[in-house]
Amino acid sequence: MVIMSEFSAVPTGTGQGQQKPLRVGFYDVERTLGKGNFAVVKLARHRVTKTQVAIKIIDKTRLDSSNLEKIYREVQLMKLLNHPNIIKLYQVMETKDMLYIVTEFAKNGEMFDYLTSNGHLSENEARKKFWQILSAVEYCHNHHIVHRDLKTENLLLDGNMDIKLADFGFGNFYKPGEPLSTWCGSPPYAAPEVFEGKEYEGPQLDIWSLGVVLYVLVCGSLPFDGPNLPTLRQRVLEGRFRIPFFMSQDCETLIRRMLVVDPAKRITIAQIRQHRWMQADPTLLQQDDPAFSMQGYTSNLGDYNEQVLGIMQALGIDRQRTVESLQNSSYNHFAAIYYLLLERLREHRSTQPSSRATPAPARQPQLRNSDLSSLEVPQEILPCDPFRPSLLCPQPQALAQSVLQAEIDCDLHSSLQPLFFPLDTNCSGVFRHRSISPSSLLDTAISEEARQGPSLEEEQEVQEPLPGSTGRRHTLAEVSTHFSPLNPPCIIVSSSAAVSPSEGTSSDSCLPFSASEGPAGLGGGLATPGLLGTSSPVRLASPFLGSQSATPVLQSQAGLGATVLPPVSFQEGRRASDTSLTQGLKAFRQQLRKNARTKGFLGLNKIKGLARQVCQSSIRGSRGGMSTFHTPAPSSGLQGCTASSREGRSLLEEVLHQQRLLQLQHHSAVSSDYQQAPQLSPVPYVLTPCDGLLVSGIPLLPTPLLQPGMSPVASAAQLLDAHLHISAGPVALPTGPLPQCLTRLSPSCDPAGLPQGDCEMEDLTSGQRGTFVLVQ
């Protein structure tokens, strides 16, 4: 992390021991806000208007041609965007090696950080924020600009907690009917067509991201996430996500209409504005009128604020040069002072609501005087004697190496030195007996010295787990791979897993509900057991379940909270589509934390599918995990399968193959406890498609069915043909007497009383237990 002191030491020989502030042009640098690989963001204050700004300092020497073009395009887009909910561009300064972008400073930071610290928003708060986001995105689309990286990290909050849309690095121009083909964005917020590598319409891409953003605002978690990018890609393509119980039906409907897999069937911005959830608060409809807020910002069209121009002229700034800068969109010092003063004027009006009823000619002189009294213009800009422009921005002097190491990191020593220099706070000696020309006052004083230096280091962020509460509706789950010899794995294979959902749908995948679910149900088979956080008696906090972080970029694990609380019953307040999870399956484990920050990527279409990734993991499992067990002879055939044959399998075949490997592992682990048990020949028995009982104590398959060298696909196929007889519907059980080795479970059967080594599907209702058969 680059640390730069707010003040710099005075060069030796001055005879003064005080420290002097650093300055970039007309901006006094205060501190570092953040940095990346080739850029650093500084907080600075304009010396004339006393307004805080953010200066993004970019090292052009460390950018290739494509990234440099991206930076210039971002600047070009920001010059065209003048909206109260979009970060305002004030000034652009450029040297041979450096680029300085001065923008509006949002003092309350990112919406992402706000959610990680305070939890999810109420729907009323989320509606207000979403109206502002929608207004900014609609303004961009009306100007044929698509953002393509909408996420909570790019939504900033100003001093009034209003939204400011930022970071147009992936933005671009678009024309209706001409699709785009740059597959970029942040994976959790990216649309399905980006992962598939299809051409897309820009607005439809932003609407999908808007749906994810609204979900995050209301829920405090991501709708689509996964331990890796292939898993995340699969979930996005399926369009399935979970809805918490506290979300209203109208909000759920709006989110589902935005998160539609088929982009042609997604809701439009005009339809979003007319949605019932958006229209629930009439006061927000009256505030959504940017016409008044945009007064004075459309200066390139000749709409100038005469009040601001009068203030600048009173300060000695040439009016004609200011107007020319605004007309040409130069974004130099003249334009920067104009826009900063305009912002100050708006703040002054907002603090005096009664002034709107006063006639404009009567209050205009009062506002001008108040603005002039609060500007605190430095002494060097007052008219005196003529002076050389170099005195306003002298060439940087060489400082001692020890001073540089104590104040400026090695990266900023060379990259920022052309613009940073010690400034004497008492400028009376420099400008004594000299007059100042308004024209030379605002010349861009930037040194054109070349620079060389090492690369910038990345700043490490402090990662903190967030408190949360329980209570969430679960409609999708994964299979837990954590089991013990006494509790062998049960893998549920759904026939719809390998089938893509119908276009234009966004449905849940419901699992059977267990009426006897308790604290042990959700915590038994989790990689990180327990739940995080506490619940508020006033309003529900964000319901985070503690476990491994599902962010595909960082993949960090969550810590346990200070207090482990039992899960809230899912039976209270559930709608007809609400479901919960059976024991042994992973619960909903997404949470929005500081270490879950996502980054934008190019080439999301190059992410491999889930089937290929599962295949590779099965290869590693067969080579590493099986080597610790004394497996029977057929396992050599499983290990000898070539990679090329695995790559051609479908997702269902790979899941069956993994099920077979897990069964063999468990069978080998517990076989030593049953060496004296009689070996019973298997009896063909017809089961329903949902039957998934594992037999521990008898051979899993007859010896003739498992031959050395048999492929796992053929083994799984014979398993289905010989024993399961899976069909489209449930098959009736035989009415004759059952063999002695087979008994039917009674509804009152207690699973805890089973002999060691026996297993069954856990958390089943009484009606479901009657349809399963336990093999003893």
From Swiss-Prot:
Protein kinase domain location: 27-278
GO MF term set: 14-3-3 protein binding; ATP binding; cAMP response element binding protein binding; histone deacetylase binding; magnesium ion binding; protein kinase binding; protein serine kinase activity; protein serine/threonine kinase activity
One cellular component (GO) term of this entry: cytoplasm
Any GO BP: protein autophosphorylation
UniProt biased composition (Polar residues): 628-643
Enzyme Commission designation: 2.7.11.1
Assembly: Interacts (when phosphorylated on Thr-182 and Ser-186) with YWHAZ. Interacts with ATP1A1.
Boundaries of every UBA domain copy: 303-343
The protein's required cofactors: Mg(2+)
UniProt gene name: Sik1
Region described as Disordered: 350-371, 449-472, 621-643
Annotated effect of mutating residue 322 to A: Abolishes ability to regulate sodium/potassium-transporting ATPase activity following increases in intracellular sodium
Name this protein carries in UniProt: Serine/threonine-protein kinase SIK1
Active site: 149
Induction statement: By high salt diet and depolarization in brain.
Binding-site residues for ATP, renumbered to this chain: 33-41, 56
Enzyme kind, highest EC tier: transferase
Function: Serine/threonine-protein kinase involved in various processes such as cell cycle regulation, gluconeogenesis and lipogenesis regulation, muscle growth and differentiation and tumor suppression. Phosphorylates HDAC4, HDAC5, PPME1, SREBF1, CRTC1/TORC1 and CRTC2/TORC2. Acts as a tumor suppressor and plays a key role in p53/TP53-dependent anoikis, a type of apoptosis triggered by cell detachment: required for phosphorylation of p53/TP53 in response to loss of adhesion and is able to suppress metastasis.
Residues with PTM Phosphoserine: 186, 577
The family this protein is said to belong to: Belongs to the protein kinase superfamily. CAMK Ser/Thr protein kinase family. AMPK subfamily.
Known catalytic reactions: L-seryl-[protein] + ATP = O-phospho-L-seryl-[protein] + ADP + H(+); L-threonyl-[protein] + ATP = O-phospho-L-threonyl-[protein] + ADP + H(+)
Activity regulation comment: Activated by phosphorylation on Thr-182. Also activated by phosphorylation on Thr-322 in response to increases in intracellular sodium in parallel with elevations in intracellular calcium through the reversible sodium/calcium exchanger.
Entry-annotated residues carrying Phosphothreonine: 182, 322
The record's account of how the chain is modified after translation: Phosphorylated at Thr-182 by STK11/LKB1 in complex with STE20-related adapter-alpha (STRADA) pseudo kinase and CAB39, leading to its activation. Phosphorylation at Thr-182 promotes autophosphorylation at Ser-186, which is required for sustained activity. Autophosphorylation at Ser-186 is maintained by sequential phosphorylation at Thr-182 by GSK3-beta. GSK3-beta cannot initiate phosphorylation at Thr-182, it can only maintain it. Phosphorylation at Ser-577 by PKA promotes translocation to the cytoplasm.
Keywords linked to the UniProt accession: ATP-binding, Biological rhythms, Cell cycle, Cytoplasm, Developmental protein, Differentiation, Kinase, Magnesium, Metal-binding, Nucleotide-binding, Nucleus, Phosphoprotein, Serine/threonine-protein kinase, Transferase, Tumor suppressor
Stretches of the chain forming a coiled coil according to its record: none
